[in-house]
UniProtKB/Swiss-Prot annotation:
GO cellular component terms attached to this protein's record: cytoplasm; membrane
Recorded family membership: Belongs to the thioester dehydratase family. FabZ subfamily.
Organism in which the protein naturally occurs: Syntrophotalea carbinolica (strain DSM 2380 / NBRC 103641 / GraBd1)
Molecular function GO labels: (3R)-hydroxyacyl-[acyl-carrier-protein] dehydratase activity
Main location: cytoplasm
Catalytic-site annotation from UniProt: H49
UniProt-listed HAMAP family: FabZ
Reactions performed catalytically: a (3R)-hydroxyacyl-[ACP] = a (2E)-enoyl-[ACP] + H2O
Protein name: 3-hydroxyacyl-[acyl-carrier-protein] dehydratase FabZ
Amino acid sequence: MTLEILDIMKLLPHRYPFLLVDRIEDLEPGKRAVGIKNVTINEPFFQGHYPGHPIMPGVLIIEAMAQVGGAVAAITAGDKDDQVPYFTGINKARFRRPVGPGDVLQLQLELLSSRRGLFVFSGKAYVDGNLVAEAELKAVFAPRSQD
C-alpha cells in the first residue's frame, strides 16, 4: 500500500512546517512501512542549523520516523477518526551521519509489538543506502483536540 501526502494528512495531525513525511511506500498494516522525506534547502530549520553548513537536526529525523510509525499505527488500528497517534517514548537513538539539503531520507519502520493500544516500532533512516539514524519508538492513541 502506498500513501501520498493527502492520505498522510488524513491520518496525522501534523502540518507545515512540521509534517516531515512526503510519501509512504510498502505499507503493510500491522507490520512495516517505508517513508520518504525529500530534504530541501527550503526547510525552515536550515536557517539556524547551521548557517553555512546546513544539517537536519537529528531529533527531526527521529520525528520523521515517528510520523511514519504514527501512520502505520493509524492504519493498523483502523476506525480512529476521533483520535490521533501520540509519540510517547524513544529508546536506543543513534545518529550515524549528517543529513543535508538534497538528501532523500528513506525511513524504514517495523512494528515490533502492539498491546493495549501501545505501539512499539524499530526505526531506521537511510540516505543513499547508508544508515544515518536509528531508534526504538513508542506511540499511543489519544482523543483528537476539539479546538
